[in-house]
Amino acid sequence: MNSRRQHRTTTKLRPRHRTARFALALLVTGLLASAWSHAAAAQQPLQKLLVLDFELIDQQADVVPFPEKEARLAMASQRLREALVKQELYDVIDIAPVAQLIRTEAARQSLLECNGCELDIAREAGADRILLAWVQKISNLILNINVKILDAKTGQVVMTNSVDLRGNTDQSWQRGIDFMVRDMVEKNEGNR
């Protein structure tokens, strides 16, 4: 009788073992496919990305002074460029060769709404993609950081991202940019 009970127990466990082996095989296959796709992506050359400086959309500009505006926008632009390079999301190219063209266009209008002038700037710089970045300031407490990446040839939007901030400080802006880049890494949004 004891051997019969043992046989039943063994028989009951066998389907579980098959299911576990099947699940393990699926897991290993998935991991190998993921590793292969990451390796293939790593072998592709990085897209050349021109990162324009942050612009500020400030709905209270006439009412609430923001004396550190220029310094904070410059800090944010530099931090974003460095983070994209560090994470190897793009080949961020130097903005200096097109700085005069950028100044000329920016003096006429916002580069966020210039009807394609940003694409001309990107092509002049030899970029595959261009990143437009802006901070929308609702108040000193409520802000958001936004980025949009466009294909320099077609103008097609290839990625957008936005992060809400609470507080208008260097630290909140830095954390927002760090979060945005980390989110891009986690979602595999680089090199698009």
PLM region descriptions:
Residues D128:
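Conserved acidic residues
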Residues I95, W134-V135:
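Surface-exposed patches in mature extracellular/periplasmic domains of secreted proteins
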Residues A23-A35:
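Bacterial N-terminal signal peptides
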Residues W36-A42:
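Sec/Tat signal peptide C-region and signal peptidase I cleavage site
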